[in-house]
Each structure stands twice: as C-alpha cells, then as structure tokens.
Amino acid sequence: ETDLLLDDSLVSLFGNRR
C-alpha cells in the first residue's frame, strides 16, 4: 500500500510543475 506515498510524491512534483 505504498501507492499513496508514491502518489503524494508525484502530486507534489506535478503540483510544482503546474
């Protein structure tokens, strides 16, 4: 169940790119 952790990381990066 590390999908959430990975998602968080991606979201952080994507959010920054936004």
UniProtKB/Swiss-Prot annotation:
E.C. designation(s): 1.11.1.24
Modified residues (Phosphoserine): 12
Manganese listed as a keyword: no
Cellular component aspect of the GO annotation: mitochondrion; peroxisomal matrix
Broad EC category: oxidoreductase
Molecular function as annotated in GO: thioredoxin-dependent peroxiredoxin activity
Domain Thioredoxin positions: 1-18
Keywords (A to Z) from UniProt: Antioxidant, Cytoplasm, Mitochondrion, Oxidoreductase, Peroxidase, Peroxisome, Phosphoprotein, Redox-active center
Catalytic reaction annotation: a hydroperoxide + [thioredoxin]-dithiol = an alcohol + [thioredoxin]-disulfide + H2O
Subcellular location: Mitochondrion; Cytoplasm; Peroxisome matrix
Main location: mitochondrion
Oxidoreductase as UniProt keyword: yes
Transmembrane segments: none
Superkingdom per UniProt: Eukaryota
Extra remark beyond the main annotation: The active site is a conserved redox-active cysteine residue, the peroxidatic cysteine (C(P)), which makes the nucleophilic attack on the peroxide substrate. The peroxide oxidizes the C(P)-SH to cysteine sulfenic acid (C(P)-SOH), which then reacts with another cysteine residue, the resolving cysteine (C(R)), to form a disulfide bridge. The disulfide is subsequently reduced by an appropriate electron donor to complete the catalytic cycle. In this atypical 2-Cys Prx, C(R) is present in the same subunit to form an intramolecular disulfide. The disulfide is subsequently reduced by thioredoxin.
Family: Belongs to the peroxiredoxin family. Prx5 subfamily.
Primary role: Thiol-specific peroxidase that catalyzes the reduction of hydrogen peroxide and organic hydroperoxides to water and alcohols, respectively. Plays a role in cell protection against oxidative stress by detoxifying peroxides and as sensor of hydrogen peroxide-mediated signaling events.
Assembly mode: Monomer.
Name of this protein: Peroxiredoxin-5, mitochondrial
Organism expressing this protein natively: Mesocricetus auratus (Golden hamster)
